[in-house]
């Protein structure tokens, strides 16, 4: 009797953990494109509390789409109530970026935003893709 109760309890814990892992799996992100910059093969996830600060994680290829323009590219990401964090790419290259953005004062974040931009210098404004908004499910 006791062994079967332990077996049932262990199976329940196993399937609960498997369900949590699926709920926090990586999800696909659409390709973002603007003049001179692309963010491709993107995936994101909202980490559960106590895992990577309960933050927003993303991984994608940041592509300098116009090699001859002499401008750098970068990704910006932010979570609710905070300013944009900038992650630089390289000119004339494709760079794989994997980062986490989080609120250090909270157990987890509920809203996250991401976009890719081309740095056109100080005299002209940068051009950015549309901003994607993700919420915790």
What feature does the model see in each segment?
Residues 1-23:
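Secretory targeting and sorting signals
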Residues 23-137:
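Post-signal peptide N-terminal regions of Sec-secreted extracellular proteins
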């Amino acid at each position: 009797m006791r062994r079967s109760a332990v077996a049932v309890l262990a199976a329940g814990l196993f399937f609960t953990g498997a369900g949590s892992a699926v709920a926090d799996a990586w999800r696909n992100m659409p390709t973002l494109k603007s003049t001179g910059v692309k963010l491709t093969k993107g995936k994101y996830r909202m980490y559960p509390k106590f895992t990577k600060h309960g933050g927003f994680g993303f991984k994608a290829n940041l592509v300098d789409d116009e090699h001859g323009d002499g401008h750098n590219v970068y990704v910006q990401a932010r979570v609710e109530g905070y300013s944009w964090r900038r992650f630089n790419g390289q000119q004339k290259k494709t760079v794989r970026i994997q980062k986490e953005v989080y609120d250090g004062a909270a157990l987890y974040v509920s809203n996250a935003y991401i976009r890719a931009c081309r740095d056109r210098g100080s005299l002209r404004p940068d051009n950015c893709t549309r901003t994607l908004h993700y919420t915790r499910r």
